[in-house]
Amino acid sequence: MSSCKDSLSLMAMWGSIARFDPKHERSFEGPEKRLEVIMRVVDGTHVSGLLAHDDDVWQKVIDAICAHIVSREFNEYIRSYVLSESSLFVMKDRVILITCGTITLLNCVPLICEAVSTVCGEVEWVSFMHKNYSFPWEQKGPHLSMAEEFKTLRSHFPSGQPFIFGPIDSDHYFLYFHSDVVQPSCSDDAQLSMTMYGLDRNQTKHWYSDKMLPTGPETAVIREATGLSEVVDDSWILHDLQYEPCGYSINAIRGSEYQTIHITPEEHCSFASYETNTCALNYSKCICGVLRVFDPERFSVIVFIDPDSAVGKSYHSGGTIGVEPEYYPNYEAHHRTVNEYTPGHWVLKVNYVKRAVGTVGTSAASGAKE
């Protein structure tokens, strides 16, 4: 509990789990930490980039955070790993590592940087992000507080900058990013992330098991029963895992695209996350599909808007991008954050709370542009 002396840690406790009861012996930290390292290709960089590394390299990265690889799927563009606590994606020019629970994600930064150096690449862009933790007092190492995370990240990337997106006393994201872009280039990456709380109990009952179930007929039944098969359809290569006694993860890849979903079903701390890099002019169809599966009491959606991406072009031309309140009449938008965190790169985050029965309608988001 020493971290509670840090005012930012105290603030981070507010709002994530609305009905937290300390009498619960087991409360799992669903909200993930996310680390992305993008490599600059220079003269002499291995033609396959980070894909030149075999699994031994990534196993060492995972060992550094005390997790392990459960399953893997590959295609020409992506190596996808389901981990004991979340996911790893490796592409030619980047690594994306997403971990839940009390995993000390920042401990693997030196090994990822070493992997970049080994193939004669250079670190061009780093981002570390997480939703405010549900149970921050249970975190370990550099994740005991935002101050410790900032200190650790600054030691690795001194020119990086920290941001908080959203109200500090409620649902918000902490982002630290480092940019060493030498010359402007086409910037068309896409990232849509959702965090959902208070999941539909008729759905969460499916994510309990008396044994761990890897991808197979039994997990196919779970996907069909819950509607996940509509989100991750047959066009995707998938691998999933039903945890024992509860919890579920799925990774899916299609060409250079990925989707990942992680579920904590316990009633007192039910949570699900969704992320994809799929390009779209408007994300409403994707978001609505995810909401149909989980029907959460509240959710946050965050979109990173690169200037040359499909969603970036739509946003800058004045079009809607699918996160606006008119798409979600069963929810009320409680706060919106818009931030140009580096020139030309914007982030848009909206917090939604389910409306009371009989009050369905359309509302404008409250909050401010930051």
Swiss-Prot record:
Binds 1 pyruvoyl group covalently per subunit. InterPro entries: AdoMetDC-like, S-AdoMet_decarboxylase_euk, S-AdoMet_deCO2ase_core, S-AdoMet_deCO2ase_CS. The modification Pyruvic acid (Ser) is found at residue 86. The keyword Lyase applies. Substrate binds at residues 28, 85, 266. Pathway: Amine and polyamine biosynthesis; S-adenosylmethioninamine biosynthesis; S-adenosylmethioninamine from S-adenosyl-L-methionine: step 1/1. Pfam families: SAM_decarbox. Belongs to the eukaryotic AdoMetDC family. This is S-adenosylmethionine decarboxylase proenzyme. It comes from Trypanosoma brucei brucei. The lineage of its organism: Eukaryota, Discoba, Euglenozoa, Kinetoplastea, Metakinetoplastina.
